[in-house]
């Protein structure tokens, strides 16, 4: 499809591109056109770039023929100064007020460019519960807290989202793909009052749900073949990916998953995937205590939502966490040592294996090795270091004692006589109510954009209870303390059932509120959840939604270990992916780069020029959406494309412009331009 000659109708572009001129640039560097084709992170086992799906380099003049002002792009300025690439690290996102205001501004910018809701999108059944501050008026646990709090604050909530928007939103959130056109129409036509809950059950029990949440927990547990400290190899990634996938598919309780991560035994990380979690948390280049400390910090962040536990692994909290954490400011380094001591008798050891012409390693875990093999792991946490990645560990800091016995700092308990240390730690962590709070809050953030505690990995244990509020000037950390407590209690009572928790969240009226808001919006209301905050789709979601809607299924060869994949949500890791399209939407590497939601010029260029899009909008591709639709009338074709790509009918203005365009010039070319434009619209790129 040619765009270089400026064929694309300006009026069509004006209507179909919802531009809001908003571009994040917290930290940027200028890159030239010759750097657009960045390959994926290269390693010894990286698969080759696939030409059919790779980004194609185009001139800035070509890019200028499409309206990319949605990403804040001015093509004349781009031609003069190059393109800006967002670069942000995990540590940049600690300012929760800043995060909230960015989300709120983004939501206002996006929703201001969405089309007005057509009459056909009106809800066809009574859904509104009675308003009031009586929790008994609300059947959903979440609504019993959200709506009385809104009433007390004097903040009117947004109205309920339409059926068209709901099916798209919940399908993306639960499965990582947009819904099929026929499913949209059948859902909207259904007049039964329980159709939303039945749709939720359908999605939660789908194979695509397993794909989406295997990717999510792979991110959370940082399942990668290589990080800055250790190499787990693709076989290790695949083994852990399979363990996560099987755990979710079989409904394994989340506390059991956590116990297996902490207490796993095995000799081969290529066969027992959970081994890779502890191994991946190792720290090389220093004494064995560095390994133990890093694994302890990983456990605190992933399972307790307390990343700042890592801070007291180097020093007391005083002078470092005073303004950040009421608990942390008084926490002692010796408490970290007590916690780390649970892992002090666990050694990760490597076994060399030859695969083809290369030598690599698989890992095993063993407790208290035979004397003479590795004497470091025969005792409790030892205070005998002056070098390494952390400050000295010396007896003087612990009353002259040379070892520190294991004590779980939040309960004061240690292992029973003869009890395996890691088994004892697994029991302490999963019976700690903070484990349930963290699990619930991590998932809440995925559905609402921000956590009840936000950031979700920075819990302060002394600021969570509204019945025991912290002393001034400290304030309660959760936006809704009672909701967080009751939701965590419900999670425990229902057997740590992840599906049950998600079902409660998406069936709540709070989740089903519109992202549009009538009246003046105050960004401080974000934490009241008075409207749905928008989010940009993950790179994997965009890829799979384009693939599904177009009907053109790719065949990616990820190499001998990972095999062949068609869907990005099934890629075993995020560091190595076969298409740059996904990487440019900031999917992270599960190490130092977290998954981000920012937008960038690079993303705009991908949506306009990458083969993932352009190869799927051509009328000549017999397997494609257009080739299968060109026998329709113009009216039918426009409706069909909008429903297939955007899960809604076009507005009257959109339809009039699109039909007029199809009636002039070459119909096939105009149809290609229309489909290409839909893939570049705000309401395709964002989940709202």
PLM regions: where:
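Sec-dependent N-terminal signal peptides
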Residues: 2-28
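Secreted/luminal cysteine- and crosslink-motif detector
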Residues: 10-11, 69, 312
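Signal peptide processing junction and immediate N-terminal pro/mature segment
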Residues: 20-49
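Short, functional "switch" segments adjacent to catalytic/cofactor/reactive centers
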Residues: 39, 43, 51-53, 58-167, ...
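Short, structured secondary-structure elements
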Residues: 65-66, 118-361, 436-474, 478-485, ...
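Alpha-helical support elements that line or immediately flank enzyme active sites
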Residues: 488-492
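Conserved, function-critical positions that sit in or immediately flank catalytic
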Residues: 647
